[in-house]
C-alpha cells in the first residue's frame, strides 16, 4: 500500500481542483508541486526521516502542503489544536519526542523569549499568506514578525525551493500521525495512526458515496487535529480525486457562497454546524441542488434535526440527505454510517466495507441482535497504539479470536439487518465521532 503522499501521485499531472481557500483554488498538479517544494525546504532545515514534528495550524493550504511533505520525507506528525498555548505546545513536544514545531506566527510576539530560549526548532506561518499581499502586510501591523535565526524559520519561504523528488521509503504500517483525544475512557491520550489506517479509510469512500467523486468538493471546516477533519475533510477527498474546501472557522456566509458557486458538494459536520445552517436565511435560499451528501456525527444527534434538514433538501430538489455515522479516533474516525441506499432512523448505520462491528458482554461473548452490550470494532483502520502507554493500549486494543479489536466503551446493539444503534457510554460522557465534545461549540461558533 502507498504512503499518504504516494496515494496522490496518480494525480501528479491533473488539472482537477484539489483545494479551495478563500477566493483561491489549487489543482492537484499545483498541490503536488507545493508538497515537493515544502519537502525540499524541510529537509534543508534539518527535518529527516523518523523525526517527530509538531504542527499547530488551522485549515490552510500550507497545512495540507506540509502534511503531505512531512509524510513524503518520512517524518511523524504530532498534530495539535492551533489555539494551544505556547507552554502547552512545548509540553506536548516533550511528551511525543518532537524536536521541531510548525506554528502560526500569531504566537511569536508574546512568546518570543520562550521560543528563542528553547533548543527546539520552530517554523512560523503567516495565516494570511494565501490571501493577498495586503492581507499579509496588515497581519504584521497586528502581530510581530518572527525574526529568523539558527532555530527560528519562516515556513512560507518554502515556495522559493526547487521540488524535492527524493522521497524516503517508509513502512505504511508504522506510526506516522499522532492525534490527541480523550481515549475510550476519557483520560487524555496520544493516538498513533499509520499511513495504512488513513489510506484504508479513504479507500472506503466508494462504499459511502455513490458514483465518481472526481471534481466534487468536501467542506473541510472541522479541524485537522482530529480524525474526522483530517481523515474525511482533507485526506479522503484528495485520495479520491476530489477537492477539499478549506475553512479556518465556520462561516455561514462563506459556506453558502461556496455552495452557490458549486465549490461545496459534500459536508461533514457536527450537530451545531447544521443547526446554524438551518437558521441562516442565505442557506435556505441557496442552490442546494449543488449538494450531494451531508454527513453528521455527534452526541445525541436530534432526530428532528435530521428530518428538518432532509425536508429542506427535498423542497430544493437536492439529492443530499443528512446521514448519521459513528466512529472514534482509535479507528481514525468513521467506522459505521448510514448511506442513501441503506438508511434507518435512529441508527448510525452499517459498518464500512472491511470493518466488523460486534456487540459483546463483559466476558467478550458476542450478543445476539437487539441485545445491548459494549461495541467492539475490528478492521484495517485501527490505531497502532496509545503512544508510550502500553497498559492503556492493552485495555483498548483487545484480542478476540486472534484479531485486534477496539473496545469502544460505547453501549449499543445491532439489529437483524446489521444497523448499529447507540445507547450511551459505559464510563463517561458520550463522545462525538472521533472528536471530543468541546468541538461542538468551540470549533463552530
Pin down the residues of each PLM region.
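Conserved AMP-binding/adenylation subdomain of ANL enzymes
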Residues: 199-217, 225-266, 276, 280
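Conserved AMP-binding/adenylate-forming
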Residues: 21-24, 39-84, 221, 436
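Gly/Ser/Thr-rich phosphate-binding loop
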Residues: 265-269, 278-344, 356
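Structural core segment of the AMP-binding/adenylate-forming
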Residues: 44-45, 72-158
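Conserved pre-ATP/AMP-binding loop-to-beta segment of ANL
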Residues: 144-180, 187, 210-217
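Conserved ATP/PPi-binding loop(s) of AMP-dependent carboxylate-activating enzymes
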Residues: 343, 350-354, 365-397, 435-438
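AMP-binding/adenylate-forming catalytic core of the ANL superfamily
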Residues: 63, 84, 92, 101-106, ...
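Conserved AMP-binding A3 loop
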Residues: 27-29, 167, 176-200, 338
Amino acid at each position: 500500500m502507498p504512503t499518504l503522499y504516494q496515494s496522490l501521485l496518480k494525480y501528479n499531472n491533473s488539472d482537477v481542483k484539489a483545494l479551495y481557500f478563500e477566493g483561491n483554488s489549487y489543482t492537484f498538479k499545483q498541490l503536488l508541486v507545493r508538497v515537493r517544494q515544502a519537502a525540499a525546504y524541510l529537509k534543508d532545515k534539518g527535518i529527516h526521516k523518523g523525526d517527530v514534528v509538531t504542527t499547530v495550524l488551522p485549515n490552510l493550504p500550507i497545512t495540507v502542503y506540509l502534511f503531505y511533505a512531512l509524510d513524503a520525507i518520512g517524518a511523524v506528525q504530532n498534530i495539535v489544536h492551533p489555539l494551544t498555548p505556547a507552554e502547552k505546545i512545548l509540553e506536548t513536544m516533550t511528551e511525543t519526542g518532537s524536536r521541531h514545531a510548525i506554528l502560526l506566527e500569531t504566537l511569536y510576539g508574546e512568546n518570543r523569549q520562550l521560543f528563542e530560549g528553547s533548543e527546539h526548532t520552530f517554523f512560523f506561518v503567516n495565516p494570511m499568506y494565501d490571501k493577498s499581499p495586503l492581507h499579509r502586510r496588515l497581519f504584521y501591523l497586528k502581530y510581530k514578525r518572527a525574526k529568523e535565526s539558527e532555530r527560528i524559520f519562516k515556513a512560507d519561504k518554502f515556495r522559493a525551493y526547487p521540488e524535492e523528488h527524493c522521497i524516503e521509503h517508509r513502512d505504511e504500517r508504522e506510526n506516522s500521525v499522532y492525534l490527541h483525544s480523550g481515549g475510550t475512557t476519557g483520560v487524555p491520550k496520544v493516538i498513533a495512526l499509520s499511513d495504512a489506517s488513513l489510506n484504508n479509510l479513504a479507500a472506503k469512500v466508494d462504499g459511502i458515496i455513490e458514483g465518481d467523486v472526481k471534481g466534487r468538493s468536501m467542506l473541510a471546516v472541522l479541524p485537522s487535529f482530529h480524525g474526522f477533519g483530517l481523515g474525511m475533510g482533507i485526506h479522503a477527498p484528495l485520495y479520491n480525486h476530489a477537492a477539499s474546501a478549506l475553512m479556518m472557522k465556520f462561516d455561514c456566509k462563506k459556506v453558502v457562497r461556496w455552495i452557490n458557486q458549486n465549490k461545496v458538494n459534500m459536508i461533514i459536520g457536527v450537530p451545531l454546524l447544521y443547526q446554524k445552517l438551518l437558521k441562516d436565511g442565505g442557506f435556505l435560499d441557496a442552490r442546494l441542488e449543488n449538494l450531494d451528501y451531508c454527513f453528521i456525527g455527534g452526541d445525541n444527534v436530534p432526530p428532528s434535526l435530521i428530518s428538518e434538514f432532509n425536508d429542506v433538501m427535498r423542497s430544493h430538489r437536492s439529492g443530499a440527505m443528512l446521514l448519521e455515522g459513528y466512529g472514534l479516533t482509535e479507528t481514525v474516525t468513521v467506522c459505521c454510517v448510514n448511506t442513501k441506499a441503506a438508511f434507518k432512523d435512529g441508527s448510525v448505520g452499517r459498518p464500512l466495507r472491511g470493518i466488523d462491528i460486534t456487540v459483546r458482554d463483559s466476558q467478550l461473548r458476542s450478543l445476539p441482535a437487539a441485545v445491548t452490550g459494549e461495541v467492539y470494532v475490528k478492521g484495517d483502520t485501527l490505531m497502532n497504539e496509545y503512544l508510550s502507554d502500553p497498559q492503556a493500549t492493552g485495555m483498548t486494543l483487545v484480542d478476540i479470536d486472534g484479531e485486534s479489536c477496539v473496545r469502544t466503551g460505547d453501549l449499543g446493539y445491532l439489529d437483524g439487518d446489521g444497523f448499529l444503534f447507540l445507547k450511551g457510554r459505559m464510563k463517561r460522557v458520550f463522545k462525538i465521532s472521533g472528536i471530543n465534545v468541546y468541538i461542538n461549540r468551540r470549533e463552530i461558533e
